[in-house]
Amino acid sequence: MRIGTTMPNNACITIAVCSRNRPQQLHAWWAHIGTIAGSDTTPILVIDQSDVAPMIPRAPNLTIMHRPGRGLARARNLALAHATTPYIAFCDDDCRPDHDWLTAITTVMHQHPEVALLYGAVWPSGADYQLHHHHTHAGSTVWASRRDGLVCSALRVAATPSHYTTPVAPLECLGQGNNLIVARAAVQQWGGFQPWLGAGAWLQAGEDVEITLRLLSHGAVCMYEPQIRLRHDAWQTPDSLMATEHGYSVGMLAVHVWYALKGVDVAREYLQFRFNTAKKTIGARDETHRRSRTFLWARGWALAKGIIGGVSLWLVGWTKGFPKIS
């Protein structure tokens, strides 16, 4: 399926950021975006769900939509509905794209106009850090640590491009939503982001994973390109990251329970891996792997909520379908 067309950058891509009650991050993001090649002629869309409207300098190519509320998936759908370009490039307000980010996106889109979802590389901000790989059933995910004890997650540093048309593990094989380019034609055909998923929603995460599995299930082209690079400036304490990971677990489990019930093999493989890992954690006897009772309760609640959410999504999916993007 031919998704896009060959056209100049400023008519091809809209940059979109979704933010809520993070004025400092949004100001820093806006100041940085102006340094990117081609950003002065590229439409920029800010979906702000803050309690108070953002006060950032205006520009002719900037549109701010202030919609107080919660829900990253809902905000992404607003961006998809409002944008008029064939592609929407999403990044988070704590991400800093490289100078040639737009150029790299445009190059891939011209070479592969059939692509429905395109993921880019996400590196930690700064220079004095160490990368760590967490091995899973489908490869590995990456996080970083600094000497001051802070850590950074939601990274993707693979050096090799990838190209898929059947379901794979999205995080290990493609990337995540903090550096994601979406073809509007694809979501017009197969629907937008599921609003129960993602930050601010009751299932807390996984909206990017779900839409990737859905499009791949339809045979759409999803790609990863390491030259489309940005830096993730989201350093936090290990305790803070652990709390974040509990939320991620809810969304990830919900998505994979849902898709396992739909018969998607990669979802079943993920669930088998997660439950085997959970059994090892609960049964650990040595001090190195033993977890506190507080951790086990929090993770157990996340597992239960994710399972309930996945079954609920499966049931609702039969009747309501997916958000329509016109």
Put a short name on every predicted segment.
Residues 88:
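Short aromatic/hydrophobic "clamp" motif used to bind/position activated sugar donors
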Residues 175-178, 199-210:
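Acidic donor-binding loop at a coil-to-helix junction in glycosyltransferase catalytic cores
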Residues 138-172:
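Short, flexible, basic/aromatic active-site loop/helix in glycosyltransferases
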Residues 17, 21-37:
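Short, well-formed alpha-helical segments that are part of the catalytic scaffolds
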Residues 100-147:
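Conserved donor NDP-sugar-binding/catalytic core segment of glycosyltransferases
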Residues 30-66:
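Acidic donor-binding segment of Leloir-type glycosyltransferases
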Residues 67-83:
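Glycine-rich, basic loop-to-helix element that forms the pyrophosphate-binding segment
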Residues 243-250, 261-326:
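Non-catalytic, C-terminal membrane-associated alpha-helical segments of glycosyltransferases
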